[in-house]
Each structure stands twice: as C-alpha cells, then as structure tokens.
Amino acid sequence: MVKEIASWLLILSMVVFVSPVLAINGGGYPRCNCEDEGNSFWSTENILETQRVSDFLIAVAYFSIPIELLYFVSCSNVPFKWVLFEFIAFIVLCGMTHLLHGWTYSAHPFRLMMAFTVFKMLTALVSCATAITLITLIPLLLKVKVREFMLKKKAHELGREVGLILIKKETGFHVRMLTQEIRKSLDRHTILYTTLVELSKTLGLQNCAVWMPNDGGTEMDLTHELRGRGGYGGCSVSMEDLDVVRIRESDEVNVLSVDSSIARASGGGGDVSEIGAVAAIRMPMLRVSDFNGELSYAILVCVLPGGTPRDWTYQEIEIVKVVADQVTVALDHAAVLEESQLMREKLAEQNRALQMAKRDALRASQARNAFQKTMSEGMRRPMHSILGLLSMIQDEKLSDEQKMIVDTMVKTGNVMSNLVGDSMDVPDGRFGTEMKPFSLHRTIHEAACMARCLCLCNGIRFLVDAEKSLPDNVVGDERRVFQVILHIVGSLVKPRKRQEGSSLMFKVLKERGSLDRSDHRWAAWRSPASSADGDVYIRFEMNVENDDSSSQSFASVSSRDQEVGDVRFSGGYGLGQDLSFGVCKKVVQLIHGNISVVPGSDGSPETMSLLLRFRRRPSISVHGSSESPAPDHHAHPHSNSLLRGLQVLLVDTNDSNRAVTRKLLEKLGCDVTAVSSGFDCLTAIAPGSSSPSTSFQVVVLDLQMAEMDGYEVAMRIRSRSWPLIVATTVSLDEEMWDKCAQIGINGVVRKPVVLRAMESELRRVLLQADQLL
C-alpha cells in the first residue's frame, strides 16, 4: 500500500512542476537573452562549442557504463536484475540524448530535432519508471542492511567462539602434555617433581610447591618445591590457618593473598614485592584416607612472577585443576604399584622358600628312596632268604631242643623283618598287622628264651613267672606281639648293661576283674562283632630289680597303669629311645593293646607293662574246623601229592631269593625253571621258544622287579590266558589284593616266603583251578 501511494505522489509532483514551466514558456523553449562579448573566451560560440564537446563526452561515458553493467549481470547471480536493466536503458537513453543534443548547437534539420525530442521523452519516461522502481526497492534495501548488521554480529560472536575453542584446544594441549609427563614415572617423588617442573614451564611460574600433612595431622609440611627457599625459614603451616582451612574445604582453585603465610613460604620466603599472584588447590591423598569417609589432602601452590600486572586467567586455573586431578590419580597408582611391588617381592621370597623346601623335600625323598632301596637290598632280601631256609629246616626231623632253637630263630627273624619293614613304612605312617590263630604258650616260651639270652649277654639275671591258667589258642598278630616283648626287654636291659645285682622279672598273667570300658583307650578295642566272653586280656609285666632296693610290686604297677601310660623319658633314656617308644606304642595300639611305663630315679624305665586283647579260639576238635592250623607234614606224608611234578616257572631278580624259593618249590616236589627278569619269563612261555611253553602250569612271579614289574608281566601273560600266576610281594593289603585280582593273578604269597605258606597257596590255587574246570 505504501509503495502505491509513493508512486502516485511522484507522478503528481512531476505534473505539478512540469505544467507551469510549459505554461510559462508558452509551449516552447526559452531563449537565451545574452550579449556576445566578442573576442572574450566566454563568447557565445565558445560556450556552445564547449557544451557540445561536453555532451559528446557525457554520451561516451553513458555508453560505456551499460557495457560494464551488462558484463557484471552476465557473470554473477545478482538479485533485482530487472532494476539493473532499467538503469542500463536509462543510461543509454541519457547518452543518446546528450549525443543528439550535441548536434543541435549548429544548424540542423528537422529530423534531428525530432529524434532529439523523441529520445528526450523516452529518457524522461524511463527515468520516471526507474525512480518509481527505486521507491519500491528502498524497504528491501533497508532489510538487507539490517541483515548485514546481524551477519556482522554473528560473525563477531563466531570469532569469539572460535577464539574460545582455540583457547580450549591450547589448554587441552598443555593438559595432555602435562599428563603425559606426569605419567612417565611410577615413583611418587618423581611424579611430584615432574609436575612442578612441567607446570612451571607451561604457566611461566616463579615457584611451585607441594604441602602435605604430617603424621599427626596438625601441620602442613613443605615436602616438594621447585626452587629452594630463601631467607624465610618456615617450612610448616598449622592446619588451623585460615587459608589452609579454606583450601581444604573447597575443590576449586583459591587465589591467595601475597601476605598469606603459605603463599610467602611457597614463594621462596623472599620479599612480598617479588611474589606475584598465588593460586592453591587441594589434592586428595586416596591411599592414606581412612574408611570412615574422612579424606586426607595435600596442597598444590603455584606462584606467578612478581613485578608484572599478570593475573590468573580462566585457562590457567583450568590447567591447574586438571593437573591436580591427574597428580592425585598418578600418586594413587604409584602407591598401588608400590604395594604390588612389595607383594610381588614377598611372593617371590615365598616362592624361593617353597622352591628350596621343594628341593629339600625332593632330596629327602631321594634319600628315603635310597635308604629304602639299601634296606631292601641289604637287609630285607637277605632276611627273607634266611627265613625261607629256616622254614625248610623246620620241616626236617629235629629234636625238641633243636626245634625250639630253630623256631626261636624264625620268630627272631620275623621280628627283624618286621623292624626292617617298619623302618621303611614309618614315613608313610603304615604298620601292617596280620591277625591269625597262634599258640600263646609257645609264643611266651620263645619270648622268654630270647629274653633270657639277652639278659645273660648283658650280665643280668632273668626270672619268669607265667600263670598256668593262660589260654593257649588265641587269635592275634603273633609277630607283632613277639616284637613288642623283645622291644620291652631291650628297653629295660640296655640302660643296666653289666650292672651288678640287677635282675629282670618277666611275668605273664591273665587280667582278672572288670576293665573300665568307658576309658577312651579301650573304646577302640571293642567292636560289635566281638563280645566280652570271646575276648581275653593278657598282661605282660617286666620289672628290673636291684638287690639294694625294694622292687616295685606288680600290683602297684597294675593299679597305676592308667596314670603313667603316656610317660615320656628323659635323661639317660634319650630322644632316640623316646621316638622308639612312640613307634612301639603305635604298634601296640594297632594290635589292640596298651603299654605303660614307670621310670626309675635315673629317668630310665624301671617297670613296663603291656596289656593286650586277644580273641579266644575254640580248642581243636577231632574233626577239625575251618580255623584249624594246617596239618603237619609228618602226620600227612602224602600231602604233597598234588604238587609233585608240578611245572613251575620262577621269576625273581634277586639271586639269593630266587635260589631259596627254588629250593622251597623243589622240596614241595615241583619241577622248577628259574629266570631272572620279566623279559626272560615272557620269552620262556612264548610260543616257539626253546622251552616247552605248554608244560608250565604255574608262574611264581615277584611283583617288585626293576626293569619290568610283576604287574606288567602278569597283564601280558593274562592277555593270552596262559598259566596260573602266584605272586610274591613284601606287603599285602586289601588294595594290592584287589589290584592283583583285577589283573588276573590267582594267588599271592607274602614275603618272606616260607615253606608252608607257599604250599598252602599253591594248593589253594590248584584246587580252585580244578573246580573252575
């Protein structure tokens, strides 16, 4: 609406101003009423000539401007092109008007005047149209100006934001550089000094210091500083200081006054004029904080150079905050690493100790294995050979005295064999027992004979007193009973060797009266399968008596048995005897007994009492029973008819044992072929060998062989269902028996191999094989 009103007002003003001019001039052009001054420069002719030249020059200028505008419009995307085209037309018409006007100063034809008039009218119309168009464009141009102002403002804001971004980028660069330098080391002192140096370089600081709380938490101590202190001697600030309290309570950077005590101390202790602006921030010490939520803080103080109007900027404060956080984390990591390093060193030390203990254990195991091998080769195998030979001698026709001596030798050999076996089984805590029927009277008689020999050899008199009412047929471990009795005799005789007037009293009696069944030491004896009527308790008491002192009564010994059962000896008895007594006591407990000791005045044992429980065994009936002992060989002269002519292959790596076992088998009537290894055994029974493999009916196999043990040989034999296998082994428990049964071994004889044990096992194996067939 405003644009239309402005256009009509412009047209109306032109009509108002042009009409009077036309009326005044009567419709024609005014004529100049000038006087020509003749020869003057400003003569009429000169003026007209000058105007004509000016018109031509104006026309040339007007014609050149449209060319430039046309080139500009064609080369760029300019808004309002139609306005520019109006300007071009207006300028061209103006140029034509001036050009034609230049020809009218002299005599000219009517057509020129007519053309001049037409172009002038066109110029007037175009100029009016252009003016009207400009009126409509002015508001748009004003909007463009406003937009220009807005763009300038936005450009200014953008420049400011770019500046902030550049500042942040620079700050980030400094922070990354400082963080990288801080994290290069894992030592806390190096971390702090690196922080001080790099932060001072980055921010151009005069000094930089770290304050930490003392052990009591009452003061802040200056612990790390970039530059040494000057004349100011204070290096501690109280925790109650206002600046310290303000810093510790705020997590922001605090700008301190130069008069502050912590600021002066951090600035090197010099003049206040030499210190610039001071900033401080707390650093949490995570590793020394308690679990109640109370944190411990260190303080980082940064001092700007003095004598300059420089102050802390936002960028510098942000750098200090980030560096403080990074230092806190780095110190915490360093503390964790120190603890880890200490733990690693402790673990390494423990590992070295474990390795040393492992080597010691390995050496001990090797020494034990060497000891066991030596004991086995040097003592156990020869003892087994001797016992085997003695078993053959027992089968000969001997007088009663000779038979008693041989039987005593066999019992003593069994004790020796048990001792050797126990010495090898002590580290494992295993002591084997073998419960079987035996004659108690014969065992007591043989033990008394052996004790008498020991006493006479040591110059001590020996007395024996055994009740006639003692049962004879009992069930127990005969070898262990004999071993314990000999140990007691040796323990009493050895400390009094060649002592004048000493005598050893050996008494055996049946325990009468009721025992205290609630005693924990007797609780292990009782079992649901046994009743009180089927058990018998026998007490073996040995007492050393001197002629010049009254002997200890056996009744008192029996009454004090419960009190002194766990006595350990000292003095002359010694640590070795004490250990031996401990082993003996363990053996006694295994055979359902208890042992007690009464020490003498010198600390050596004076009285020892052994109480054992045996199972009663019914007397042998005329028809025999399942528990009856094997029939005597002389009473049954044809008992070996089953074994006579039996083809046996004997496999044993020990020459002496192999020879003794061969003699035993030959005495039983077997035809024996002996080999010294498992390979020779497999070769001997293999098809196509020089030996007739089908003639071997039984293979007697030693399980403890060096190159190829008996288990592997037995498995190879059983893979083709070859002859019956009877194994010989040192120790036989339920686990070993199950293993032998799984492999296919038909029978097992425990070493030492004696005649009757071998005969009984071979007979059982052959009868079982016949029943299966």
Swiss-Prot record:
Residues in cross-link Glycyl lysine isopeptide (Lys-Gly) (interchain with G-Cter in ubiquitin): K751
Pfam families tied to this protein: ETR1_N (PF25487), GAF (PF01590), HisKA (PF00512), Response_reg (PF00072)
Keywords from the named record: ATP-binding, Copper, Disulfide bond, Endoplasmic reticulum, Ethylene signaling pathway, Isopeptide bond, Kinase, Membrane, Metal-binding, Nucleotide-binding, Phosphoprotein, Receptor, Serine/threonine-protein kinase, Transferase, Transmembrane, Transmembrane helix, Two-component regulatory system, Ubl conjugation
SUPFAM superfamilies xref list: CheY-like (SSF52172), GAF domain-like (SSF55781), Homodimeric domain of signal transducing histidine kinase (SSF47384)
Chain positions with 4-aspartylphosphate modification: D702
Miscellaneous: ETR2 is degraded by a proteasome-dependent pathway in response to ethylene binding.
Function, in words: Ethylene receptor related to bacterial two-component regulators. Acts as a redundant negative regulator of ethylene signaling.
Listed name of the protein: Ethylene receptor 2
Organism: Arabidopsis thaliana
